[in-house]
Structures are given as structure tokens and as C-alpha cells.
A protein has these predicted regions:
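Structural motif
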Residues: 6, 37-39, 67, 136-138, ...
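Short glycine-rich anion-binding loops that position phosphate/pyrophosphate groups of nucleotides
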Residues: 11-12, 42-43, 141-143, 209, ...
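Alpha-helix N-cap/helix-start motif
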Residues: 15, 75, 105, 147-148, ...
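Loop/helix-junction capping segments adjacent to catalytic residues or to phosphate/diphosphate-binding pockets
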Residues: 44-47, 73-76, 102, 106, ...
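Canonical P-loop GTPase G-domain recognition
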Residues: 62-65, 70-127, 131-136, 143, ...
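C-terminal effector/interaction modules appended to NTPase cores
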Residues: 148-369
Length: 369
């Protein structure tokens, strides 16, 4: 199977206050997992917990393998009774063993390998990439930029481009000078593009530079953002769903609530995108909209999410695909639209800017809008 992440669920049937917290954690993990190994003791009298887990796992379309843990030889006689109380168990592959017997381990591993079917689709980071072409990474470093390394999306893009026999070229744009209105920074950028033997095939930019890049990028050069690249990659190709959510921006009204969700906990200083730039855009155009934030790898419960008109999510580069897909599933189940940092910042520059950053992905925003 390769490297795996294991979620343990001790205390799932505890009735105490701590037990309730454990249950909440288990059901959060259930949303993110790919495989549920349900260990059942046939000699138990109450199977309400097992019934609840199987029902919820099936609702979430999770694969379930059942392990009957036999503490006594005659415990197997009760399996029919278990499946009368939890009839859904009959629809899943199962094995009988004595978990405390180390000799059962090979049989358990073989059972898992033979029956687990991964649904993880292999995603290409930049599916539009072509061999022997230049690709520009526009990286306007600021006070938040760590020394000695690229950010993860930048490093991933450079590695992917190189691995696929193309040529990544980094460019540092001075946002302050470019926005000051002088011609010097634009001339420097044009000279940079002119220095290639042939046009770069595409530019991948930091989303915060979209106010400049959507007009500076020549029409014959593709354009997208690191945030859009990452959200498509981590969501396993669900970029179009985030594009659909952008329509909720135009319908924001006074009193609406917007959640800005950022999956990491970096130090937020200066002109941070999530806490400064996006909120400033919202307050400028919709001053009476309430803005909340969700930082880190844990997401809000559905009861809280229902109060939001829109969720604007980061690129998701610091969480797993399973965790992001669990967030998407929650939002879709309660009908809350969601979009992405890069899409939002492009949208705020006008329809043509959004069309431009979606073109490399084969998405026609005009058809959606």
C-alpha cells in the first residue's frame, strides 16, 4: 500500500464529556480516511456504535473492511447475531481472527491488500505543460517570504517543470515599484520576456500580483497562479467547482458572512493575503459584510459553516487531499459556495483576468458566467 496515515479511535463508545470529544474527533477522521477497518467483538451486547460507524462511512462513500476479533473460539457463533443487529455489515468483506495472536498478522495484511481499492486519482500539477518550453515563476518576495527556500507551491512547480523536460525560470517582481505608477518596473519585466529565445509558454504568478500580471502578460503567453495550481492539484482536479463558487461573490449583501480559510499557520505580517489583502477587497466593495477566519488544519463544524454565504479557501498546499476533499464535501452537503484565493483575486480584476488564468486549465469562464 505504501506510506499510510493511521487514525486510532479508542473510546468511541464512552459516554463522558471526554468521550464526546473523542467521538467528534473520530467522525472528523472518518471524513478524511480512505479505508475503514471496523474491528468488532462478537461477544459485545450493544452494537449501536458499530451501526453508527457503518452507516456514516457508507454515507461518505468510504470503503469498509470488517474484522471480527475473536477472544474465545466459540465467539464466532455470535457473528450471525451481530449481522442481524448491524445488517449493513453483510455487504462488506470480512475476516475472522484473534487480534492478540501475532500469527494472525500476515492473514490480516493479506486480507487488506486483496480487498482495498484505492480511489486516489493521480493528478498532474501542471497538465498543460509542454516539453522544451519556458515557464516563468513570478515570485514577488515580501516580509513573509522565508529565507533560504521557496514556498512549497513554488518549489513544486519548479521541480515538476524540470522533471518534465521543460525550463522553469524565476522572476522577482517589485510590487511596490510596479504599483507606484513608474515605467521602470514594467520595462524591466518586458526586457526579461524579450531576453528569451522564444516566448515563455506560460507564467505562474503569486496571486497577489494579479492586478499587474493580467495586463502585463502578453496575449500569446498563458497565465495562472500558484494558488489555482495547488487547489486543482490537492482537490484532485475539482477546480471547476471552485470556479462555480466565485459567482457568490457578486451576490454578497450587507450582513452576509464570509469565511476565509487558510490551512496553515505561518506568521502573518505585513500585507498578508488572507488577513489583509482579501479582506481589504471585500470591505472596499461590500463594507457591511462580516469576515471570519479559519486557520490551521481543523475545519469548522457544519452547524457553524451554515451561517456563511461564501468560503474563500487558500491553495491547500499544507493539507492532504483527503482533508481538503472532506471540507469540500461538508460545504456541498450544506449548500455553501466555495472558491479560492487565486480565483478571487483574479475575479476582482475583472472577467477578462479570470478568463485568462483559467484558460491553461481548459475552463471557459464565459460559459460558466
Amino acid at each position: 500500500m505504501g506510506p499510510v496515515k493511521l487514525f486510532d479511535t479508542a473510546g468511541l463508545d464512552e459516554a463522558s464529556g471526554l468521550g464526546r470529544k473523542k467521538r467528534a474527533k473520530v467522525f472528523a477522521d472518518l471524513k478524511e480516511c480512505d479505508l475503514v477497518l471496523l474491528v468488532v467483538d462478537p461477544e459485545t451486547d450493544d452494537f449501536a456504535t458499530e451501526n453508527e460507524i457503518v452507516t456514516k462511512a457508507r454515507e461518505l462513500d468510504k470503503q469498509i473492511l470488517v474484522i471480527y476479533n475473536l477472544f474465545r473460539p466459540d465467539a464466532a457463533e455470535r457473528i450471525a447475531l451481530v449481522e442481524e443487529q448491524v445488517p449493513l455489515l453483510r455487504f462488506h468483506q470480512k475476516i475472522r481472527l484473534v487480534a492478540i495472536d501475532a500469527q494472525c498478522r500476515p492473514a490480516l495484511l493479506q486480507f487488506i491488500l486483496e480487498n482495498f481499492a484505492s480511489k486516489n486519482a493521480t493528478m498532474e500539477l501542471l497538465p498543460f505543460l509542454q516539453r522544451d518550453e519556458f515557464y516563468v515563476l513570478n515570485i514577488p518576495m515580501d516580509a513573509e517570504t522565508p529565507p533560504g527556500r521557496y514556498l512549497r507551491p513554488q518549489a513544486m512547480a519548479a521541480e515538476y517543470i524540470t522533471r518534465h523536460w521543460a525550463w522553469p525560470v524565476s522572476y522577482r517582481m517589485d510590487l511596490g515599484k510596479a504599483r507606484a505608477g513608474g515605467a521602470g518596473e514594467r520595462k524591466r519585466f518586458d526586457a526579461f520576456l524579450a531576453g528569451f529565445g522564444k516566448r515563455p509558454k506560460a507564467i505562474i504568478t503569486d496571486s497577489q500580483a494579479m492586478d499587474l500580471m493580467h495586463t502585463w502578460t502578453p496575449d500569446d503567453v498563458g497565465l495562472t497562479t500558484f494558488s489555482i495550481m495547488m487547489i486543482n492539484y490537492v482537490s484532485r482536479g475539482r477546480l471547476a467547482a471552485f470556479v462555480n463558487g466565485i459567482e457568490a461573490v457578486a451576490s454578497l449583501r450587507a450582513g452576509d458572512r464570509v469565511l476565509i480559510a487558510e490551512a496553515c499557520n505561518h506568521s502573518r505580517i505585513a500585507e498578508d493575503i488572507g488577513t489583509v489583502q482579501i479582506p481589504n477587497f471585500i470591505r472596499k466593495h461590500w463594507p457591511d459584510v462580516q469576515i471570519d477566519h479559519n486557520f490551521g488544519r481543523e475545519f469548522q463544524e457544519n452547524e457553524q459553516l451554515q451561517s456563511y454565504k461564501l468560503v474563500i479557501h487558500c491553495g491547500g498546499c499544507m493539507i492532504t487531499a483527503q482533508k481538503l476533499l472532506a471540507r469540500i464535501r461538508d460545504l456541498e452537503s450544506i449548500g455553501v459556495p466555495y472558491t479560492n484565493y487565486g480565483l478571487f483575486l483574479s475575479y476582482m480584476q475583472g472577467p477578462e483576468a479570470l478568463r485568462k488564468v483559467l484558460r491553461p486549465w481548459g475552463i471557459d469562464y464565459a460559459a460558466i458566467a
